[in-house]
Amino acid sequence: MTAAPKRPSGQEGFFWKTKTLEEMSGAEWESLCDGCGRCCLNKLEDEDTGDIYFTHVGCKLLDAGTCGCKDYPNRSDKVPDCVRLTPANVRTLNWLPPSCGYKLVAEGRDLYWWHPLVSGDPNTVHEAGVSVRGRVEGSEEEIPDADLEDHIVQWPALLPKRARLKRRPKD
């Protein structure tokens, strides 16, 4: 049995700082997802302005407790309008939340302290208040499309103050 690889000290050597999105392996690409679940919330688009509005209604496959997909490998079959993120489309999708690791790296920015690749802990996304845990009102299977306007919220498009800090706060 081999020892687990050591995390680099500081942030030198982290792949997202040295590789383009196109150069990343499949595993590296997938690890850019912080597991917040914000992209799995239903969104509405204003037909006149093109503005995007988040709701606190989750996709039918969103596990609101873990903030992950209940059937990730088959999500496109079960949810045909599920958008698969690619290096090309993360640069153009205007509805990705400001905290999105894919979006940050595509823009040449660094990941936040709470991103699991930086913290080494998948729970820091919840600790920082970035995830949808405890904030999903219901599933799209429970809330009719006609009622979605009643569920518009602003928080998914905002970054909590705690999450904007340069490093993990000491409690």
Swiss-Prot record:
NCBIfam families (UniProt xref): PRK05170.1-5, PRK05170.2-5
Coiled-coil ranges per UniProt: none
Species in which this protein is naturally found: Bradyrhizobium diazoefficiens (strain JCM 10833 / BCRC 13528 / IAM 13628 / NBRC 14792 / USDA 110)
Name by which UniProt lists this protein: UPF0260 protein blr3103
PANTHER family: UPF0260 PROTEIN YCGN (PTHR37421:SF1)
InterPro entries linked: Puta_zinc/iron-chelating_dom (IPR005358), UCP006173 (IPR008228)
Family to which this protein belongs: Belongs to the UPF0260 family.
Pfam families associated with the record: CxxCxxCC (PF03692)
Endpoints of the signal sequence: none
